[in-house]
Amino acid sequence: MGAIAAGIAMAGAAIGGGVGDGIVISKMLEGMARQPELSGQLRTNMFIGVGLVEAMPIIAFVVALMVMNK
């Protein structure tokens, strides 16, 4: 049962991370199209946002390992 729960947790986190990355990057590209002079600042903020979004699957992986090792 723990393996099923771990698999579901990882699948949800991977889907959420992919969707979140797509949203962050698309909004950054929209901002760059509107104001090209801010592209450097937008790129920096995009990398921070992607890093925060990608933390979710990493945390889910650690939790999945903890659930499977119980």
Curated annotation (Swiss-Prot):
Function: F(1)F(0) ATP synthase produces ATP from ADP in the presence of a proton or sodium gradient. F-type ATPases consist of two structural domains, F(1) containing the extramembraneous catalytic core and F(0) containing the membrane proton channel, linked together by a central stalk and a peripheral stalk. During catalysis, ATP synthesis in the catalytic domain of F(1) is coupled via a rotary mechanism of the central stalk subunits to proton translocation. Key component of the F(0) channel; it plays a direct role in translocation across the membrane. A homomeric c-ring of between 10-14 subunits forms the central stalk rotor element with the F(1) delta and epsilon subunits.
Record's GO cellular component terms: plasma membrane; proton-transporting ATP synthase complex; proton-transporting two-sector ATPase complex, proton-transporting domain
Originating organism: Levilactobacillus brevis (strain ATCC 367 / BCRC 12310 / CIP 105137 / JCM 1170 / LMG 11437 / NCIMB 947 / NCTC 947)
Taxonomic lineage from the root: Bacteria, Bacillati, Bacillota, Bacilli, Lactobacillales
Membrane topology: Multi-pass membrane protein
Record key words, sorted: ATP synthesis, Cell membrane, CF(0), Hydrogen ion transport, Ion transport, Lipid-binding, Membrane, Transmembrane, Transmembrane helix, Transport
Identification of the protein by name: ATP synthase subunit c
Keyword Ion transport in annotation: yes
InterPro entries xrefs: ATP_synth_csu_bac/chlpt, ATP_synth_F0_csu, ATP_synth_F0_csu_DDCD_BS, ATP_synth_F0_csu_sf, ATPase_proteolipid_c-like_dom, F/V-ATP_Csub_sf
